[in-house]
């Protein structure tokens, strides 16, 4: 995406050899964080200053998220609507919903990742964090936030959230 490329160029221009960076995203930002986490070439990240990732309530894939929302919001099955929309996306834009898979990207991630998800999230259902966590090679940590709905973990538990993130990040940023 253009914003990711801009971010890379901008970061490259301000980063020095001593720069240490955490990529942290919530909701769509979490999905983007996980997508970026798998962008490696020859086993190396293009940005060596990235030290770890924190994702908060990201989805497994666009397909899974759309399928879940069709069911939850409209009580509709994936077929034929999602299949048709996927076909149209492939025709018009050259990619499909199955390609936008954070699950596939985290499998390639070699850097540490903290997974955060509210146990009351129904927009990006809590179940999605478990296959993501299982797919990600070590090092990794998981924090399920009791009672938190979608993207509300920090708002509901600001002190605990900050402590979890600082403790995790502190292992990798010096």
Predicted regions and their residues:
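Alpha/beta-hydrolase active-site loop
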Residues: 1-14
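Gly/Ala-rich beta-loop-alpha elbow adjacent to hydrolase catalytic centers
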Residues: 25-29, 33
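Hydrolase active-site cap/lid region
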Residues: 35-98, 104
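Short alpha-helix in the alpha/beta-hydrolase fold that links the catalytic acid
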Residues: 102, 111, 125-134
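Short beta-strand/loop motif that positions the catalytic acidic residue
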Residues: 108-110, 115-117, 121
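Acidic catalytic loop of the alpha/beta-hydrolase fold
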Residues: 119-124, 151-152
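Catalytic histidine neighborhood in serine/cysteine hydrolases
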Residues: 133-151, 164
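Catalytic active-site module of serine/aspartate enzymes centered on a nucleophile-bearing elbow/loop
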Residues: 156-174
